[in-house]
């Protein structure tokens, strides 16, 4: 059998926010107003093919294909103040009010921004499952395979103007930052995994399960960025926003777009991940209770190549993740049930976050990698009792 699905979405979100910070005395009050429009279409086609060569063997094949495209346009205003701006005005983000508050020495910074983005993604893959029963007591062996390939691209135009009222330039004027960038990012992804699971009945209602899974992930991204932050202020003020209308902005630039290529903001990255996953589980099914306990050990090797901010990176990381699990369900009666769930999980920091690179493309949101980031271990425990 098979299925086909199409989904269309439209979004219009207008948000306003007022914040008072009781920790920082400088810039204790902030306001923002944002308008975000979105639209998207997605298509998904799936098939299911099943074959039973005999009564003990079951083979399933599930091909799937998908396509999606999404548009976004966003505009926003924000400002930070030394005092509550609503004492002076009901509209603290208006340009006239900001000028009045600036004269009173209340302004810390202000920002106006807009962006237009488009993304397109295509993927194809298939899943294979082969299950073989070895006896009537529950002994069986299962082979799972999965291959998926995706190809995507995105275009993004972003423009921001930041005014720092308490930071002066060499001439004693307020510092003003203008950031105008256009980027194109093609991305390719490969994912392949294979899993072999063996279940052995120990005694009636009790099973031991051993599983091994190998996963290979590959991702390649090559973002090309053009920076035209040095153009005259107000060049794009008369351009109306619209979906995919970046050419209306780029057409106002002098010369060719290639003249504005920015190597330091462009980014090439290649990521390969080899994951071995070994699981050992114990399962007990009785009349009044069920018990599941197990542990997963996951050694993995990651290879990461990146060219960004004029820094070349070529590194390899080897880590081991551990995840114990415990689930218990006891049925006192038809109306009363007790459930206990526990799961522990090791999490590794993203390799890009470990690089000692400073990203100051947004003066109000400067990011810096931390090579000293350590793995984390999360414990999740849930106790649930139900009766009626």
Which stretches of residues belong to each language-model region?
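Primarily recognizes Gram-negative and organellar outer-membrane beta-barrels
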Residues: 1-388
């Amino acid at each position: 059998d098979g299925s086909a699905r199409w989904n269309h979405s439209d979004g219009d979100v207008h948000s306003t926010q007022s914040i008072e910070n009781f920790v920082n005395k400088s810039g204790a009050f902030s306001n923002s107003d944002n308008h975000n429009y979105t639209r998207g279409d997605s298509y998904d086609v799936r098939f299911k093919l099943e074959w039973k060569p005999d009564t003990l063997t079951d083979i399933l094949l599930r091909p799937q294909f998908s396509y999606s495209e999404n548009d976004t346009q966003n505009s926003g205003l924000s400002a930070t103040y030394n005092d509550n701006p609503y004492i002076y005005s009901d509209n603290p983000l208006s340009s006239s009010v900001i000028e009045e508050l600036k004269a009173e020495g209340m302004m810390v910074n202000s920002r106006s921004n807009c962006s237009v983005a488009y993304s397109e993604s295509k993927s194809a893959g298939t899943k294979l499952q082969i299950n073989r029963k070895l006896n009537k007591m529950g002994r069986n062996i299962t082979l799972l395979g999965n291959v998926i390939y995706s190809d995507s691209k995105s275009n993004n135009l972003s423009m921001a103007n930041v005014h720092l009222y308490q930071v002066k330039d060499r001439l004693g004027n307020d510092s003003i930052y203008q950031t105008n960038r256009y980027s194109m990012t093609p991305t390719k992804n490969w994912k392949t995994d294979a899993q072999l699971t063996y279940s052995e009945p120990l005694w009636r209602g009790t099973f031991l399960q051993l599983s091994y899974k190998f996963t290979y992930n590959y991702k390649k991204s090559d973002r090309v960025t053009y920076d035209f932050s040095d153009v005259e202020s107000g060049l794009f003020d008369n351009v109306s926003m619209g979906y995919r209308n970046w050419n209306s902005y780029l057409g106002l630039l002098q010369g060719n777009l290639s003249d504005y290529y920015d190597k330091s903001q462009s980014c090439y990255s290649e990521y390969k991940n080899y994951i071995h996953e070994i699981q050992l589980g114990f399962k007990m099914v009785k009349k009044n209770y069920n018990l599941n306990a197990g542990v997963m050990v996951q050694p993995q090797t990651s290879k990461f190549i990146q060219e960004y901010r004029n820094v070349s990176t070529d590194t390899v990381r080897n880590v081991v993740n551990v995840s114990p699990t415990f689930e218990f369900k006891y049925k006192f009666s038809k109306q009363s049930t007790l459930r206990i769930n526990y799961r522990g999980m090791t999490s590794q920091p993203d390799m890009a976050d470990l690089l000692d690179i400073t990203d100051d493309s947004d003066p109000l949101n400067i990011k810096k990698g931390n090579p000293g980031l350590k793995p984390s271990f999360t414990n999740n425990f849930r106790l649930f009792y139900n009766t009626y």
